[in-house]
Amino acid sequence: MSKLLKLVIVGDGGVGKSALTIQLTQNQFIAEYDPTIENSYRKQVNIDEEVYMLDILDTAGQEEYSAMRDQYIRSGRGFLIVYSIISRASFEAVTTFREQILRVKDLSTYPIVIIGNKADLPDKDRKVPPMEGKELAKSFGAPFLETSAKSRVNVEEAFFTLVREIKRWNQNPQNEEMLPPKKRGCIIL
């Protein structure tokens, strides 16, 4: 039996969130940019000899949909925060996405992985060197990977790393204490 994990992929518009998700779940690259409002994908995977059903929420990067973010952040068990290596602005937005996740979760730490996408593009187009991504992720205590949805570089590894982060986070008893108590209740209509 597989364990269900809700993963949320966030980042500015146009960084390749949908391309990464579709490459993982459907093994294809979508080149055209069609702004996402919200899509959900599922994929069963075997990670470290355990079977997981990944429920991946691909979110809108555009600012006009930012009001929806709190809602999907609440439900996420882990987050891929994606920027494009050819967009300095998308890299600078990573901190804002992380802060929003921690604010909504009301925690000081949570399972995230920082992703620099579009690593297949020529170095002359690059606006964010790999070391900057690594340093930012390190300052968050988060793993960092550069990916390419187009050439399928580190696509699986990005999602698998997030699952391992969730597993590691869940095994730390201090993190259990930080979570709000599970709500139980009854509704009488």
Swiss-Prot record:
SUPFAM superfamilies: P-loop containing nucleoside triphosphate hydrolases
Compartments where found: Cell membrane
Lipid bilayer topology: Lipid-anchor
Cysteine methyl ester PTM sites in chain numbering: C186
Intervals of motif Effector region: 33-41
Gene3D superfamilies to which the protein is assigned, alphabetical: P-loop containing nucleotide triphosphate hydrolases
Entry-linked Pfam families: Ras
Summary of activators and inhibitors of this protein: Alternates between an inactive form bound to GDP and an active form bound to GTP. Activated by a guanine nucleotide-exchange factor (GEF) and inactivated by a GTPase-activating protein (GAP).
Catalytic activity reported: GTP + H2O = GDP + phosphate + H(+)
Coiled coil (residue ranges): none
SMART domains associated with the record: RAB (SM00175), RAN (SM00176), RAS (SM00173), RHO (SM00174)
Lipidation (S-geranylgeranyl cysteine): C186
InterPro entries in the record: P-loop_NTPase, Small_GTP-bd, Small_GTPase, Small_GTPase_Ras-type
GO biological process: actin cytoskeleton organization; adenylate cyclase-modulating G protein-coupled receptor signaling pathway; aggregation involved in sorocarp development; asexual reproduction; cell motility; cellular response to cGMP; chemotaxis to cAMP; chemotaxis to folate
PROSITE patterns: RAS
MF terms in GO: adenylate cyclase activator activity; G protein activity; GDP binding; GTP binding; GTPase activity; guanylate cyclase activator activity; protein kinase regulator activity; TORC2 complex binding
Entry EC number(s): 3.6.5.2
Keywords (A to Z) from UniProt: Cell membrane, GTP-binding, Hydrolase, Lipoprotein, Membrane, Methylation, Nucleotide-binding, Prenylation
Propeptide: 187-189
Binding site for GTP: 11-18, 58-62, 117-120
Role noted for this protein: Ras proteins bind GDP/GTP and possess intrinsic GTPase activity.
Name this protein carries in UniProt: Ras-like protein rasC
Organism: Dictyostelium discoideum
